[in-house]
Amino acid sequence: MRKIRTIEMKRLTVEEFREIEKMPLVVVLDDVRSMHNVGSVFRTADSFRVAGVVLCGITGRPPHAEIHKTALGAEDSVSWRYFSTALEAVEALRSEGYTILSIEQVEHSTKLPSFRPEHGRKYAVILGNEVKGVHQEVVDASDGCLEIPQLGTKHSMNVSVTAGIIIYEFARELVFD
């Protein structure tokens, strides 16, 4: 086997990326404090052609050196916007026709392996603060909650890891299927 060189990958330019059809998924970051997490979410969003990233509250915003370091420029290709609270973002996204799903451990959550996104529907997934998770009022305003089943002792994952799993599962169901 031979590794594929970067030049052989036929990557899109930022301009081409902006024009190409996106997966009908928006990732909302609710008071995420780590710039590393923010940058990683941008980079993963670029990898899977996510429609956009919504930054809320204390979540860092581009331009920012720490975000850029992890995003590797994906903050320039992926569409993003800012709201002062995630609840404001939820209201705006709902008015735009998005189904709102918080990624949180709650009573009666849907386990990710059981979830099947519908083709033709737009989704917004909300990931919360590294310590407190998604704000309760945002959970209350959501159409549902998804949970990633876990087997270890911590029952929590890094925000960017969670985002990667969620985004990949949406891509697997909506794009690669």
Which residue ranges define each predicted feature?
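Post-transcriptional modification and biogenesis factors for structured RNAs
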Residues: M1-D177
